[in-house]
């Protein structure tokens, strides 16, 4: 997953960087650095983000 893909996923969720960080158990600054490709996005983070997107889709897009 690239930083740009992470930004797109976060935007689909309607989350701020802080909200996504809280949902993933990460600091918002780490999210920002991942989105700028300054930190690698580990598989665990990628899978957790995919899970959040799946849950949103299953709920019909409602949070």
Label every PLM stretch briefly.
Residues 6, 29, 45-47:
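Short, intrinsically disordered, low-complexity terminal segments
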Residues 1-12:
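A short, Lys/Arg-rich alpha-helix, primarily the initiator
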């Amino acid at each position: 997953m690239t930083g740009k893909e992470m930004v797109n996923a976060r935007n689909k969720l309607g989350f701020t960087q802080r909200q996504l960080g809280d949902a993933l158990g990460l600091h918002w600054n780490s999210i920002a650095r991942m989105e700028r490709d300054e930190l690698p996005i580990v598989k665990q983070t990628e899978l957790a983000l995919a899970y959040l997107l799946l849950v949103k889709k299953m709920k019909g897009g409602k949070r």
